[in-house]
């Protein structure tokens, strides 16, 4: 039994040491990541290690793993516009490292490269671009401002080995004085629109009155011409129609009324020649 234990102890230690060395010489690079090897003798290796399982020399070499997937980051700053209005801006940046430049990124910036670079260049470019526009232009030409910021920021980030997939303005606010001035301007524009509407409405009503008056004048002219053409006959017809209406009204009130055509007898003549007989017994 003692011999067996001695043999186990004899082989267990080398096996354990070998297993430990093997385990420490293997490392994994997960999906969406890349690795950079640092050698204690030669420094950072230029080759970028791809995804998968790889070997290294324990103690002499160390693997530094980078996430190369696109990640979002917000950059906020407060600066002044061309007309000295205070503007607060927030940018949303989608970024990732250039895979081929990972060794240089590790040498110059380290693992927190985005924290070191993006806020600095973001604030620099935001202040530079915003200073080229008035506060009103920042609102009316927002797409132009955003495109200019994107162009300069992409170019600047490339110098540090960072690729920007998208840059957009997500938040923009102005100082209280400018906000109040914009509100006053909007109220003035609304009042001007209302006044213009009232003027147009009055003009339409005036035109309608003119058209109505012209129509009435034309109708009166037609009636006048008809009277001139028909002579007394038309007047006599109107008189008879009026007499009928009066007789109907009196009959409805209980009066005994007899209607005779105009000129139907001497007794039928009234002082006005209306052709009505009142209180006539049948």
Curated annotation (Swiss-Prot):
Membrane topology: Peripheral membrane protein
PANTHER family referenced in this protein's UniProt entry, alphabetically: PROHIBITIN, PROHIBITIN 1
Acetylation in keyword set: no
CDD domains tied to this protein: SPFH_prohibitin
UniProt entry keywords in alphabetical sequence: Cytoplasm, Membrane, Mitochondrion, Mitochondrion inner membrane
Function (record text): Prohibitin probably acts as a holdase/unfoldase for the stabilization of newly synthesized mitochondrial proteins. Involved in mitophagy; may act as an adapter for atg8 that supports mitophagosome assembly. Negatively regulates the proteolytic processing of atg32 via the i-AAA protease. Acts as a negative regulator of the m-AAA protease.
Pfam families, alphabetized: Band_7 (PF01145)
Motif stretch (AIM): 106-109
Gene Ontology molecular function, alphabetical: mitochondrion autophagosome adaptor activity
Gene field: phb1
UniProt-listed GO biological process terms: mitochondrion organization; mitophagy
Quaternary structure (record): The mitochondrial prohibitin complex consists of two subunits (phb1 and phb2). The subunits assemble into a membrane-associated ring-shaped supercomplex of approximately 1 mDa.
GO cellular component, one term: mitochondrion
Family listed: Belongs to the prohibitin family.
Name of the protein in question: Prohibitin-1
Annotated localization: Mitochondrion inner membrane; Cytoplasm
Signal peptide positions (record): none
